[in-house]
Amino acid sequence: MAAVACNNSNPLIEGWNTPYGIPDFGAVKEKHYVPAFEAGIAQQQAEIDAIIANEEAPTFANVVEAYEASGAILDRVVGVLFNLSETDGTDALNAVMEQALPMLSSHSDNITMNPAFFAKVDALYQDIENLGLNQEQKMALKKLHNSFVSNGIALDEASQARMREINAELSSLSNTFGNRLLAENNAFAAEFGVTISEYGEAMAATADRALREKMFKAY
């Protein structure tokens, strides 16, 4: 019963019935994000476990399509948080990102370093020309297969552990860079009334030489 109550009180887990599926931003609070990430990761892991446990021969439908259909909660929470963080990077959202990114990095590694899951994907990939797939399906299979290879499925255990560390560090550094870039853009807009992306137009439009010099130095 507790889990049901949690789901009903968290729009990121429960979802929303809005036109075109637009997120109900007004209902989403900072406290909802981490529990939604935890629920989303658990949901997708269970869905992947079901793909692996399927005793039928691997097919595009029961492996690739099943994987692409997984992670509905995680897709929802990532879509909301990342878009808000990139446009309205408040301290509260930044704190959420710092909690969420290591969880996401670990979850992604758990997927692409899973030998049982890769075995099913690889079986399809090795027989790709005989599966009757169209070009879009072939591309989807190749992309999924490459996600395992590029993330170290063939590495030994020690090397995979190092890969996990690198992925976590890259995720953290990318977030830090994004936060600093947004802060610089906001500071520029606060001082000059235009964003950095509007810099070129503003420089061409203003006749104030002193202002252009000031904007140039700030840019």
Where are these predicted regions, by residue range?
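Zn2+-dependent metallopeptidase catalytic domains
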Residues: 6-219
